[in-house]
Amino acid sequence: SHDWSSGGGFDTSLEVLPDSRVTPKGGERNLTAGEVAMARSVFGDGLDYDAVKVHRGGYWLFFGFQDEDTAVTPNGEMYFPGKHFKEDYSLESVGDQGWFIHEMTHVWQYQLGYWVKSIRGPRPNMSYAYTLDAGKQFCDFNMEAQGNICEDYYLAVIRGAQRLMRASKYRSNPMAPELLKTTLRDFLQNQSDSSNLPKVTE
C-alpha cells in the first residue's frame, strides 16, 4: 500500500478550476491540465498527452487478478484500483503524484514502441530496485526500475521531496539528485528517443 506524506497541488501557470465531474467505476477520463503540466516536467514533448486515459478500475478488474493496491499500465492507459483512483493527481499528495509519474513512465515506454504488456506479463517478479552508477544509462534499467527512477527524479529533483524517494537508500544521500540527473541525462535531452527504452528485462 502507499502511505505518503501530504502536501500536493502541482503548481502550474494555468488557472484551472477543479473538474467537478466524477468518473464512474469502470469508467475513464482524460488527463487534466495539471497532470499534463506535472508529466511534462519529466517527459517533456516525448508523449502524446491527448491519447492518455486514466481508468477507475483495474485492467484485470473483471478477472479478479489485480491487487487492490496495484495500478497497471499495459497499453498506454493507466488503470488504478477504485480506492486509489483520483480525478486529478496534480491536486493530490506529492507521493500520489510520484505514483502517477511511475505509471506515466509505462505510457512513455508504450508510446515509443516498447511491448509493455508482453514483456512485463510473464515476469511477475521483475525487480523495481535500482542502483545509480555513473557507468549506467537510463536504457540499462528494466521497465519497472525506469518507472521508479522517473518517479524518484520527480520527487527529489522537481518537488524537493527526496525523503519520499522509492529507493530508500538514497533518501538521505545529498548526491541523489545529481546522480538521478546523470542517469537520466540522455533521456532528458530527448524524451522522444526510443534508444532510451529498456535494453534489459531483469
Which sequence ranges carry the predicted segments?
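Short pre-active-site segment immediately N-terminal to the catalytic Zn-binding motif
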Residues: 45, 63-67, 79-101, 137-139
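Generic structural signal for small/hydrophobic residues in well-ordered secondary structure
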Residues: 39, 76, 100-102, 106, ...
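Low-complexity, glycine/serine/proline-rich disordered segments
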Residues: 1-27, 190-202
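Auxiliary, metal-adjacent structural segments of Zn-dependent hydrolase domains
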Residues: 26-77
